[in-house]
Every structure is written in C-alpha cells, then in structure tokens.
C-alpha cells in the first residue's frame, strides 16, 4: 500500500478517480449554481474522460442507476427532495467507476423510510459493481444493515474491530456494549422488510 497522506497534487489526482465520497448533507454537498448534469459530470470533465456527448451519456447512465431519469439533467439541487439529492450525490461518486466510496453519515439527514431506500440502493450498487464502502456512522441500525466488517472508535482510537456478525452478537469492549445498548428496538432490517426492500 501507499500512504495517501503523503501524496499531493498530480500524484494524488489519479487516485482521486478511484476514491469518491458521499457526504452527510445532500444539499450542502451539491453546488446550487450547477445543474445535475454539471454536478454529476464534473469529475469526468476534471479527469478528461470523453467528449461532451460521451460525458452526458455516462451521467445519464449513473442517474438511471440511482433511480433518476433524463429530465433531471437540466434541473438544480433545490428542485429535489433530500432523498433525491442524496441519489444525485451517489451518482456523482458512481460516474467515475471508483473502487472505493467513502460514505460519511449518508443517511443521517433522511427520514427512516428514505434511509431504507438509500440503504437498499447502496447494497444493490455494491453487488452490481463490486464496490468497497468505507462507511462512517453513529446509526448502528444502518451500520448493521450495510457493514461486513466494523471498527469501533472512541476518542479517535480503535477500541474494537471485527466482523459485523461477531461484533453485534458478542461485543468485547465495554464501549461497544454501551453503544449497542442504545440501539432502538425497531431495527432498520424491520423497516426494510415492511417497505418490501429485503434485508
């Protein structure tokens, strides 16, 4: 491996294509002055991928993968709901065909029913494209629904690490047990089943 914190400028640019991010606030992370086509296609332009027609086609493909259609291309972020904005942010990450997507609290600003839809979308995209996710969240129900392996951090230090199944069934560290004790009784998996989205 290579230390990413030691890379700068031109040495870092090729790696940025492989590593994309989706942030917590789907409105704050989208430039309100740009159309959806410009927002999702910005990475393609920066990396010099394709001509205008090819970029538009790839943007439309990414939007369709997240459940949005062609008329969305010319619209602006304020014209969409929070869940739709997060889909736009996911399309922006997806359009470069990265190996890894950082998901920084991507569902925390959404209500539970929309969270379920976004979680199911992320699962489907992961299966389809073989994506790796680095998922940061305080919502343990969403963590349980998405994660395969988990790191538990306290005050910036890792206190426990393991598979999701092991950590949720047999937590070892007191802080992990404390966190699990705060989980709401109704699991996200139950919401997914009720919504007919699977688990």
Residue ranges and their predicted role:
Residues 3, 54-71, 180-181:
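Conserved ABC ATPase "signature" region
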Residues 3-20, 46, 166-171:
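ABC ATPase NBD coupling module
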Residues 76-80, 84:
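Conserved ABC ATPase signature
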Residues 95-99:
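A short, proline-enriched helix->beta-strand linker immediately N-terminal to the Walker B motif
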Residues 143-145:
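A short, surface-exposed alpha-helical micro-motif characterized by mixed small hydrophobic
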Residues 161-162:
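ABC ATPase "signature
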